Amino acid sequence: MKVVRTLVMTVMVGWPGIAGAQSLLVPMDRTQHNHLKAYGLTYWTLEQYSGAEWLLNYRGGSFLLPDMEGVRRQAALRGITIEPVSAADLAQIRAVIADANMETVVLEKAPNVAIYTPPNSTPWDDAVTMALEYAEIPYETIWDDAVLDGKLE
């Protein structure tokens, strides 16, 4: 019985994902299959769960999201590469960031996004709206009247 218990513990510690990740790393380096959608996943996570981290200069500016079933589901649906991160992995990531030209930015809530564009434009008329549409990041459009009338907040 003691041998079985030791074997189970060894497998759980040695196999990432079984012991349970605390966070999900969304890499933004060449391992990421869908960079724009990854930004959208981070935005969605901030809307749903409020809280994420942007790891500046770490693997292309990766994101650290909470390991929630909804986040995993959205990543799978959107074709986004994610990596489970254990507490030990997270400590190692933080050590790498502390020792290099890197920084962690805490993201607390999803921002309001507005695009300055003519009212009759379509999303494919410019790169910004097309990128936001593809990433599934909600935005409002504003044009001259809103600016001149002082309707911006």
Task: Identify what each model region corresponds to.
Residues 81-110:
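Non-catalytic propeptide/linker segments at domain boundaries
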Residues 37-74:
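N-terminal, post-signal-peptide region of Sec/Tat-exported proteins
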Residues 71-83:
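Short amphipathic alpha-helices in soluble, non-transmembrane regions
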Residues 23-24, 29, 33, 64-73, ...:
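Helical hinge/lid and interdomain linker segments adjacent to catalytic or ligand-binding clefts
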Residues 1-5:
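Positively charged n-region of N-terminal signal peptides that target proteins for export
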